[in-house]
């Protein structure tokens, strides 16, 4: 019997002997909220919302563009490239080097993708921020793409949808990053003058100069459940004020309760909600457009009978 335990286990084909190369590393994803493991395909099929706790995970700009009608998106201003106006160098690397590395890793030129598309057949301009590109920090290209999207929407006479996530202004560009707040907001005034709506969607996280500027003056402000929205972070505020902030502070639900946003919409209902809003605006504008046309016709010279 003792010899049995000395036998070679050479023929054992248990789990430990399975070639690890045959098992992809990204089959499973751990939810950052409930810490449960989720099959990646199941997560993607559920729009990156945890099926166990409902936590909304971050999506890329390209994934958000999936809200649009299939085949309707046409990217604009993809030729805009960021520069290094200050020759900024941090302790470990230069801004130029960091940009190049981030561009190679993400396949994006900067943090925003913009263009023209449609939802339920209704044309609109769209600009989407991607947190994976330097925390979607707002620099010159970010601001220029957002401003051009607003101006294009005004020119075409169609609504603007912005999907916003950010850590704030891009520090490596100094005051140029900060001035994008005013630049985008001014472009949005031209959109308002054209009688077209700006719908802003806030997704986790949305902080700093982005929250403090153009999304907060949108005609309709939507947020995802549990999204963190604010100017400075909760920890920093507590340190400065030296007092504990209320539970749920800076969450989408807290913002809704205090009148800072208009609605909190789960990702599974987002496309349907946006379609309903766009149709509402379209129906409201139709009579106004007819009245405007009649008014312009009235100014034309009348034929002599």
Curated annotation (Swiss-Prot):
Binding positions for Zn(2+) per the UniProt entry: 31, 34, 50, 53
EC number: 2.1.3.15
Catalytic activity: N(6)-carboxybiotinyl-L-lysyl-[protein] + acetyl-CoA = N(6)-biotinyl-L-lysyl-[protein] + malonyl-CoA
Cofactor, free-text remark: Binds 1 zinc ion per subunit.
UniProt KW Metal-binding keyword: yes
Keywords: ATP-binding, Cytoplasm, Fatty acid biosynthesis, Fatty acid metabolism, Lipid biosynthesis, Lipid metabolism, Metal-binding, Nucleotide-binding, Transferase, Zinc, Zinc-finger
Pathway(s) served: Lipid metabolism; malonyl-CoA biosynthesis; malonyl-CoA from acetyl-CoA: step 1/1
ZnF bounds (C4-type): 31-53
GO cellular component term, pick one: acetyl-CoA carboxylase complex
GO biological process, one term: malonyl-CoA biosynthetic process
Known cofactor(s): Zn(2+)
Pfam families: Carboxyl_trans, Zn_ribbon_ACC
GO MF annotation list: acetyl-CoA carboxylase activity; ATP binding; carboxyl- or carbamoyltransferase activity; zinc ion binding
Compartments where found: Cytoplasm
The UniProt record lists the keyword Transferase: yes
SUPFAM superfamilies: ClpP/crotonase (SSF52096)
Domain CoA carboxyltransferase N-terminal, first and last residues per copy: 27-296
HAMAP family: AcetylCoA_CT_beta
General function of this protein: Component of the acetyl coenzyme A carboxylase (ACC) complex. Biotin carboxylase (BC) catalyzes the carboxylation of biotin on its carrier protein (BCCP) and then the CO(2) group is transferred by the transcarboxylase to acetyl-CoA to form malonyl-CoA.
Similarity remark: Belongs to the AccD/PCCB family.
Subunit structure: Acetyl-CoA carboxylase is a heterohexamer composed of biotin carboxyl carrier protein (AccB), biotin carboxylase (AccC) and two subunits each of ACCase subunit alpha (AccA) and ACCase subunit beta (AccD).
Protein name per Swiss-Prot or TrEMBL: Acetyl-coenzyme A carboxylase carboxyl transferase subunit beta
UniProt organism field: Chloroflexus aggregans (strain MD-66 / DSM 9485)
Source organism phylogeny: Bacteria, Bacillati, Chloroflexota, Chloroflexia, Chloroflexales
């Amino acid at each position: 019997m003792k010899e049995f335990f000395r036998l070679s286990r050479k023929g054992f084909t248990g789990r430990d002997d399975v070639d690890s190369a045959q098992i992809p590393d990204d089959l499973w994803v751990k939810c950052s909220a409930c810490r449960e493991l989720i099959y990646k395909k199941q997560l993607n099929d559920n729009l990156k919302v945890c099926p166990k706790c409902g936590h909304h995970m971050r999506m890329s700009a390209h994934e958000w563009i999936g809200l649009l009608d299939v085949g309707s998106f046409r990217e604009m201003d993809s030729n805009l490239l960021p520069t290094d106006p200050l020759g900024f160098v941090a302790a470990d690397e230069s801004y130029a080097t960091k940009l190049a590395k981030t561009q190679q890793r993400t396949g994006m030129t900067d943090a925003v993708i913009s263009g023209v598309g449609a939802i339920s057949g209704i044309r609109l301009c769209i600009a989407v921020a991607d947190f994976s590109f330097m925390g979607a920090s707002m620099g010159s290209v970010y601001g220029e793409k957002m401003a051009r999207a607003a101006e294009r929407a005004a020119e075409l006479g169609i609504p603007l949808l912005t999907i916003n996530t950010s850590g704030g202004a891009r520090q490596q560009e100094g005051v140029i990053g900060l001035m994008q707040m005013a630049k985008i907001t001014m472009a949005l005034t031209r959109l308002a003058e054209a009688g077209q709506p700006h719908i802003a969607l806030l997704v986790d996280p949305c902080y700093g100069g982005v929250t403090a500027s153009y999304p907060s003056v949108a005609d309709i402000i939507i947020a995802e459940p549990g999204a963190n929205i604010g100017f400075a972070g909760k920890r920093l505020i507590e340190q400065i004020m030296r007092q504990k902030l209320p539970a749920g502070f800076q969450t989408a639900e807290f913002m809704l309760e205090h009148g800072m946003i208009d609605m909190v919409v789960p990702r599974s209902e987002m496309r349907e909600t946006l379609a309903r809003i766009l149709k509402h605006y379209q129906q409201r504008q139709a009579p106004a457009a007819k009245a405007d046309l009649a008014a312009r016709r009235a100014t034309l010279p009348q034929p002599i009978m």
